[in-house]
Structures are given as structure tokens and as C-alpha cells.
Amino acid sequence: MKDLINNSIKHHSEALQLIDESVIINSASIVLDAIKKGKTIFWCGNGGSASQANHLSAELIGGMYQKKINPFKSICLNVDSAFITAWSNDDSFNNIFLRQLEALGA
């Protein structure tokens, strides 16, 4: 068990070294700029990433500040299970988020 944990830590540490921090900084700047301009942030994900997207969207709406500031415009596209299952059945799973963005005028 100890070897498994140590190997996991080693692999995660190696993966962290490969991250280009400029990509993270650029992404954060894009999100912050959109928030400052009053634009809506759209989130989406698949599987566990869908849960992450939902959480991030909820935080922007107000969870992280508990009403100390105005909420930010934030929509998580993967929470509409009725649409996702209907559209992927009737059309294609490949463009479920695109279709929602078209409907929302984004």
C-alpha cells in the first residue's frame, strides 16, 4: 500500500512539472475579463468533469462569497439532463453543448 501511495505521489508530481502555467494564467484572465464585462460564463463537462463544472458555476453564482458580493452570470450546460438525454438520443451526443449555446444566444 505504501508503494502504491508513493508511486501515485511521484506520478502526480511529475505531471505537475509538465503544466504550462502561462496557459492557466491566460485561462484565468479570460474568465476574469468576461466577469468584469458582465458576460456569462458557460461551463460543461463529462463524467466527473461535469460535477466540477457544476461546482464552479455554483461558486460564481454566489456560494463562495455567501452574498457578500453580487452574483456573477454563470450557467452549467451539463445539468439539463432532460435535454442532454433527448438531444443525444434524437440527434447526437457530439453537439449537445453547442445546441444549448445556440439556444442561449451565446
Tell me what each language-model feature is:
Residues 7, 26, 90-92:
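Generic structural microfeature
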Residues 33-105:
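Glycine-rich, small/polar surface segments that engage phosphate groups of diverse ligands
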Residues 1-19:
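Generic N-terminal amphipathic, Lys/Arg-enriched alpha-helix
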